[in-house]
């Protein structure tokens, strides 16, 4: 893949994450942190059962150890297999700075002066002599230091022998260390120290920004200026509401920059909580705060909320707690691909009793929905996409919306077009196209996915030949399905043309190109709705 590296995260180019179908060297697909140890243990046990002798190495960043699944795997490694190597790649970063007791523990190891002195000597020894003898000397020195400094290193309590920390950029040292570790007959953990962005000064200076970004100036590291994003506007609106309501608290799972909460944090530092890459904990933590009268807002990517589905059901919704989930990156995420698209949240949330689901068409409506949700007595969720917002000027003060009531933007009698959230732009474009052909089209901003506005649906069902729904979500279980279900339950036999993503994982690429490829377009909707309108006209002519 070396000669194709310039195509990474580009349409039809290399994926930004490991993908088994892309290369034999990608032994496991990954995009969400914390899975390395469990997957590697599964491979090691499979090797043992098959009588194999290959070495299995799990490489996990220090941030991944803030995720509970890593410790669940640690609890099983020494019990399930005799041979496995875990590499802890410690650079003190995930997307943002690592937080919590685990990060402090790693930092304490790294900054201990005895370890620093020992590893300086170890490095010189490896460089001078090399080979297994030098590694064994280093190992004995480490054992002496560990017994002196900590009676029981955390990982050794789990049954893994601990080595390190060593310089992760010293290739000769790494090679000799791995040669030695391969001779051992028990699970081991190697702690290596690396620098995020090493070798490129702008990346070292902007480690948060350079975690994942688009085009930039290679000389300065600067990126083009952009319009305010949905995430930034969400956080600013939330901070404004928090100015007046001391019950509002904001929670993120290691994504303060991505969710925009780094705009909330300076204004309300005591009501901002970063729990690390721990989505399940974030949700249950929010539930606990809600039981004591606070109004937790859990800002999380749609794709990452999947990791906390059970707590959403069991700890929040079952207890009818007023936790608000603000789901960033809802819809197609673009270049990050299938591990990061937010195409399933409507399907996995709308079946939960008692939750209110909303999708704003623009940033002004997002502020209104935040106000609305924070006034509710129970759980709620707001979904909004990645990237720049619509550029609408917000009202001075947000207003609570009537629950379950859609906004009719224009009336019509032939077809009713519902565009969920920012997909309202496609609904307007379809209406304009149909009206040029002589049809009367109603354009509706649903606002609420649940409860759905049955009154408005019933009103138009008696007038139109068809409904059309646009959504940035899979069709199966999505908003269009909710419309069809509501009509069926009311005994209203009106066709519903659903424009959404198919029942498959969508690859990475530019949003507009992928929409064109998969028929999330006005043209695709037109091809499906015109026959229904033409049929209605023919029936009307026959009747007359």
For the regions a language model picked out, list residue spans one by one.
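Non-catalytic terminal/interface segments that mediate subunit docking, oligomerization
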Residues: 1, 186, 194-306, 311-321, ...
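Cofactor-binding active-site loop characterized by glycine-rich and histidine/acidic residues
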Residues: 1-80, 230, 247-248, 252-253, ...
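A glycine-rich helix N-cap at a beta->alpha junction
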Residues: 2-11, 79-93, 114, 317-329, ...
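A short, small-residue-rich loop immediately preceding and capping a beta-strand
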Residues: 28-29, 52-67, 84-87, 248-251, ...
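Long, well-ordered, tryptophan-enriched scaffold segments
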Residues: 91-234
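Structural signature of the thiamine diphosphate
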Residues: 134-202, 322-327, 346-395, 521-544
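Glycine-/acidic-rich phosphate or pyrophosphate-binding loops and their flanking alpha/beta elements
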Residues: 176-179, 211-212, 229-244, 260-266, ...
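Peripheral docking tails and interdomain loops at the edges
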Residues: 215-218, 222-227, 334-336, 356, ...
């Amino acid at each position: 893949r070396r000669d194709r590296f310039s195509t990474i995260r580009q349409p039809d180019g290399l994926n930004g994450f490991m993908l088994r179908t892309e290369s034999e060297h990608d032994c496991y697909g990954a995009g969400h942190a914390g899975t390395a140890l469990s997957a590697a243990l599964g491979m090691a046990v499979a090797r043992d059962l098959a009588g194999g002798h290959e070495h299995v190495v799990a490489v996990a960043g220090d941030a991944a150890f803030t995720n509970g699944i890593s410790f669940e795997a640690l609890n099983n490694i020494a019990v399930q297999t005799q041979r496995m190597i875990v590499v802890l790649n410690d650079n003190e970063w995930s997307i943002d700075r690592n937080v919590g007791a685990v990060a402090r523990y790693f930092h304490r190891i790294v900054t201990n002066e005895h370890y620093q002195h020992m590893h300086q000597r170890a490095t010189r020894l490896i460089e001078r002599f090399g080979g297994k003898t030098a590694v064994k000397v280093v190992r004995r020195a480490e054992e002496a230091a560990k017994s002196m400094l900590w009676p029981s290193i955390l990982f050794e309590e789990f049954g893994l022998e601990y080595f390190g920390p060593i310089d992760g950029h010293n290739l000769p040292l790494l090679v000799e260390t791995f040669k030695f570790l391969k001779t051992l007959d028990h699970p081991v953990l190697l702690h290596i120290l690396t620098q995020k962005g090493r070798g490129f000064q702008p990346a070292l200076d902007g480690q948060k920004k350079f975690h994942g970004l688009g085009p930039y100036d290679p000389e300065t590291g600067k990126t083009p200026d952009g319009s305010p994003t949905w995430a930034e506007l969400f956080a600013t609106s939330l901070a404004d509401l928090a100015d007046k309501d001391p019950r509002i608290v904001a929670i993120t799972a290691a994504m303060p920059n991505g969710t925009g909460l780094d705009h909330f944090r300076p204004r309300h530092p005591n009501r901002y909580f970063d729990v690390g890459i721990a989505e399940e904990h974030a949700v249950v933590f929010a539930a606990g705060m809600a039981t004591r009268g606070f109004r937790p807002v859990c800002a999380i990517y749609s794709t990452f909320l999947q990791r906390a589905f059970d707590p959403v059901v069991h700890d929040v919704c079952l207890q009818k707690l007023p936790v608000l989930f603000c789901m960033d990156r809802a819809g197609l995420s673009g270049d990050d691909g299938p591990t990061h698209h937010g195409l399933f949240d409507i399907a996995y949330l709308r079946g939960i009793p008692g939750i209110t689901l909303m999708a704003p068409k623009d940033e002004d409506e997002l502020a209104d929905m935040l106000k609305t949700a924070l006034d509710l007595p129970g759980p709620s969720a707001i979904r909004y996409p990645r990237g720049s917002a619509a550029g609408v000027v917000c009202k001075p003060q947000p207003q609570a919306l009537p629950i379950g009531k859609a906004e009719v933007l224009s009336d019509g009698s032939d077809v009713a077009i519902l565009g969920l959230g920012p997909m309202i732009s496609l609904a307007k474009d379809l209406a304009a196209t149909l009206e040029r052909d002589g049809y009367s089209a109603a354009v509706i901003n649903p606002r609420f996915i649940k409860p759905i506005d049955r009154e408005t649906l019933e009103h138009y069902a008696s007038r139109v030949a068809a409904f059309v729904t646009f959504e940035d979500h899979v069709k199966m279980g999505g908003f269009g399905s909710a419309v069809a279900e509501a009509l069926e339950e009311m005994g209203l036999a009106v066709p519903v043309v659903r424009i959404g993503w198919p029942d498959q994982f969508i690859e990475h690429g530019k949003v507009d190109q992928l929409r064109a490829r998969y028929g999330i377009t006005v043209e695709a909707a037109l091809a499906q709705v015109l026959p229904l309108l033409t049929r209605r006209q023919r029936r009307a002519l026959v009747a007359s």
